[in-house]
């Protein structure tokens, strides 16, 4: 094979490899996979987050004395009138139904419903049960004769029993969240860290395990449908949070004064826990060396009329927990008994309601079951709102970065989240449901919905791909493609140049040969020197 043909075959192989192997391989390695997302549907949800929600809460009415066959219909009319008098941010209503044996049987199995019991009495009033979701409405015969009973029951339900919904779901409220400056953001899993701090290094012990078992475990069980607490305890020596510097400064110290003295960041970072949210209980004893006579600003705490004044003060730290400061230092080898810790646990349990957003300020939780039930519904709506915001952020992110990959897993998570959202809405909109089981299930599903949306948004493969834009791809492949392309280009140029030169040479040779042929023919015809002979 000649040198020219060999060069042609080599060039052809280069071109074939470049076109049939290099280009598909380059396209495969540089193409960013972008799974499709329901962008239009997510955008419609963002524009109107509660467009397909109408929260329905069933309420069952029963009477102990008189039988009112149509009282639930009359109450329903008054309830609708009250609810329609206020523009709602999230549509919601009460479905007033008669109490029957089916509901009674379901309640006996542990599935509690909202029940209104009408009781004949000498006065008109209402009261909410402490350990159930029952509302007692007291009426007299005059209220029956004047037909004022339905309105009074409706007013009690809307403005008192469902006061949280009435307040947070109207148009004037900024959002459905019950969080304030004190409460932490809602999380279904919360870690509780209980720490004993001693200003001295003397060994101490405390009966924290039986105290938590006897006094905090029932509280955990009560709140278990709402939050799941994990608890750890520890003892820290030689740390009184610098409280001795406040000794003698004033007779009354508030949390504002403490915030300028103590540093809780070190205490918060001592324990590792997998939960995203945490609450803290710090029980502090001063040092005997720096405060031998105790802390003068501790005036004592009075839990109730039955319990005498205790030698410690409790301070609620916004979005952190509770600090309990004892007046006197511990003696060496002291053992803090369960009886001493019991009032502290009682006070801490009371403050937890405020830290979770169930109460505001020093407000007492008079009907905890009703309040927690309302808090579940508001949390469900809050989770739906949060999930929609997360999905919309995902859509905006993918639209802003066109080079970002959208893995199939992200698309599957989004579709699953939207299906789960519809499942939650079916539970909220069904007037035939509304017991503890339904609200607990809806809350659990809404927590899973938030996790799914966050999983889709923080997908590792999608975020990692964002760090390799098109400019980086060119920078990576150009050192490889550049030399190969240059060799092929100049090789092709040289081949074409040689081909042109050879074509010119062949053309010149053909012209010379043609002239020689014409000359020979002219000689045969004796046409020499340009003269023709006949």
From Swiss-Prot:
Disulfide bonds: none annotated. Glycans are attached at residues 100, 170, 228, 247, 299. Keywords: Endoplasmic reticulum, Glycoprotein, GPI-anchor biosynthesis, Membrane, Transmembrane, Transmembrane helix. Residues 30-472 are lumenal. GO terms for biological process: attachment of GPI anchor to protein; fungal-type cell wall organization; GPI anchor biosynthetic process. Present with 7520 molecules/cell in log phase SD medium. It comes from the Eukaryota. The keyword Endoplasmic reticulum applies. Pathway: Glycolipid biosynthesis; glycosylphosphatidylinositol-anchor biosynthesis. N-glycosylated. It is a multi-pass membrane protein. InterPro entries: PtdIno-glycan_biosynth_class_S. Residues 1-8, 494-534 are cytoplasmic. This is GPI transamidase component GPI17. Belongs to the PIGS family. PANTHER family: GPI TRANSAMIDASE COMPONENT PIG-S. GO terms for cellular component: endoplasmic reticulum; endoplasmic reticulum membrane; GPI-anchor transamidase complex; membrane; nuclear inner membrane. It is found in: Endoplasmic reticulum membrane. Component of the GPI transamidase complex. Involved in transfer of GPI to proteins. The chain crosses the membrane at residues 9-29, 473-493. Forms a complex with CDC91, GPI16, GPI8 and GAA1. The keyword Transmembrane helix applies.
